[in-house]
C-alpha cells in the first residue's frame, strides 16, 4: 500500500505541531524543525515520538 500524499495537508509533527514532508525513498515523514523522521508502515504514518528516528538533511 502506498502513502496518500493528501494526508500531508492534515497531519502534523506530534512534537512541534509543524509541517511534515514526505521522503519517498525511505517511506518516512520528516519534520525538518525537530530533525525527526516518522516511519510509514503499509501506507499508514506512525506519528509517535518514541517511534521517530533522528534525521539529518543530506548535503546537496
Swiss-Prot record:
How far does the signal peptide extend, from start to end residue? Answer: none
Provide the Gene Ontology terms for cellular component: cytosol
Q: Which InterPro entries match?
A: Trm112-like
One matching Pfam family is Trm112p
Q: Which cysteines are joined by disulfide bonds?
A: none
Family indicated by similarity: Belongs to the UPF0434 family.
PANTHER family from the UniProt entry:
PROTEIN PREY, MITOCHONDRIAL, ZGC:162634
- Annotated protein name in UniProt: UPF0434 protein Ssed_2824
Q: Which organism is it from?
A: Shewanella sediminis (strain HAW-EB3)
Amino acid at each position: 500500500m502506498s502513502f496518500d500524499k493528501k494526508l500531508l495537508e492534515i497531519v502534523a509533527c506530534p512534537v512541534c505541531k509543524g509541517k511534515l514532508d514526505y521522503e519517498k525513498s525511505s517511506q518516512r515523514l520528516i519534520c525538518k524543525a525537530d530533525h525527526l523522521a516518522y516511519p510509514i508502515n503499509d501506507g499508514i504514518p506512525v506519528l509517535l515520538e518514541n517511534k521517530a528516528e533522528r534525521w539529518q538533511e543530506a548535503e546537496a
